[in-house]
Amino acid sequence: RVREIKKLVNAGKYFMINRARQYGKTTTLRALYRNMMKDYYVVSLDFQTFGSAEFETESRFANSFADSILEEFERRHREFPKKMEESLENLRRKISERPLNENFTLRSLFGYLGDLCASADKPIVIMIDEVDSASNNQVFLDFLAQLRAQYIDRDIQPAFQSVILAGVYDVKNLKRKLRPEEEHKYNSPWNIAAEFTVDMSFSKEEIAGMLEEYEADYHTGMNINDMAQWLYNYTSGYPFLVSRLCQLMDERI
């Protein structure tokens, strides 16, 4: 599954992983992060950590997003080429201005991010989890529009290698969640996204593999093939249900 998703990243795709809650999206992103670290600078963000105030104005969001980017680079990536360090320092200096720079727009932010991409010695991949937390905000849609513009112009301007959004809803369908009088605001800012067709559910074989590991430790004598088939039939491979049923059988039966 991670290998399939990485193929999209290697191909430079921007895409959305939208699945029901507890479908393994966050776990998959973490596994993908570990898998890509050697080849890319991977920046992993979570919009659940952004407060509602950070989506109130464009400048607040731009400052918060830039700050999160810098924190990720400082925490997970220790050494950078000189030009890249200069780009990071320029962005750091910009968001350190006090009082808060109300003229720091998304367009300005993406100018700094473009400089960062140009100076990096490895391509940069952005992963953003829980984008549903931001989906009712106009600032978020403006942010998507900037990503779209960056993607379209990347043959002439530096851009992220790949952008991965994760959440319950497909951001292409945000219009459905908004009041009719606001519909004029939306023009499919994420229509550049590649279709995400990777199956996130467990196959019967994957369930059997987990049961084999359990059987090797506990020697229950179960028929692994039959049990895997039963679990798959009952859950359709929904990761949370598979894990929960296995937990209940382990603890209560």
Language-model segments: residues:
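N-terminal pre-P-loop "Q-motif" helix
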Residues: 1-6
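P-loop NTPase nucleotide-binding core
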Residues: 7-23, 27-143, 161, 169-171
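Non-catalytic alpha-helical coupling and interface elements of nucleotide-dependent molecular machines
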Residues: 66-74, 152, 247-251
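The catalytic "switch" region of P-loop NTPases
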Residues: 123, 133-228, 233-234, 248-252
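The conserved phosphate-sensing helix
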Residues: 235-247
